[in-house]
């Protein structure tokens, strides 16, 4: 059977990335508390294409991805190595996004409910292997300015803290979620009874945070974590009294700690 993809291309233009995207794939996430959580991931993967080749064999991505069952750094490097070999490429890239549910206990009534967190993994290999993981955690922020100038209350809203890290040692998704929640005005909860709602509202009022505050505090926490070699923090609040959102971002290398 004729191999069209393997035909020589006369244009002689190399392509940096060729691949598949938005592939839905079942996989398991290892839990910090032992066990696994099943989820459905959205996958994009690619390789570079030599200037003399017309195309790649897309089906080979799926064949290689068949070994992806549980998320670990080791399996990602294996997949990239296999893609480079089978596609006769120099570079391979893999990106995965998936929902992950943490079980939260409400602060007063102690009732449990799941909270969805968006997780992602990005891996690339050329000469060296690069591996990033991250979370996008929903939190609660209350405006310090609104509290300061108002006689009654303060505007508050849901916000998202996106943390992306490179590490020298394994780090749990749950650890990143905890860092995001502890540096906001308050965590979010799916289930709150009236005593819980009172507690969360008052806690946020006593702990006002701009997006700038959250970004800086999260960055300082990551800066001091010996496991982390690089990070990026992006905070966005769904402003409740404005017809726009507010955001702040910072990454390692943007500043130097003094003292």
Swiss-Prot record:
Q: List the disulfide bonds.
A: none
Q: Which GO terms describe its molecular function?
A: GTP cyclohydrolase I activity
Keywords attached to this Swiss-Prot or TrEMBL record, sorted alphabetically, are: Hydrolase
TM regions (residue ranges): none
A Pfam family name for this chain?
GCHY-1
Question: What function does this protein fulfil?
Answer: Converts GTP to 7,8-dihydroneopterin triphosphate.
Protein name (database record): GTP cyclohydrolase FolE2
Q: What is the lineage of its organism?
A: Bacteria, Thermotogati, Thermotogota, Thermotogae, Thermotogales
Gene behind the chain: folE2
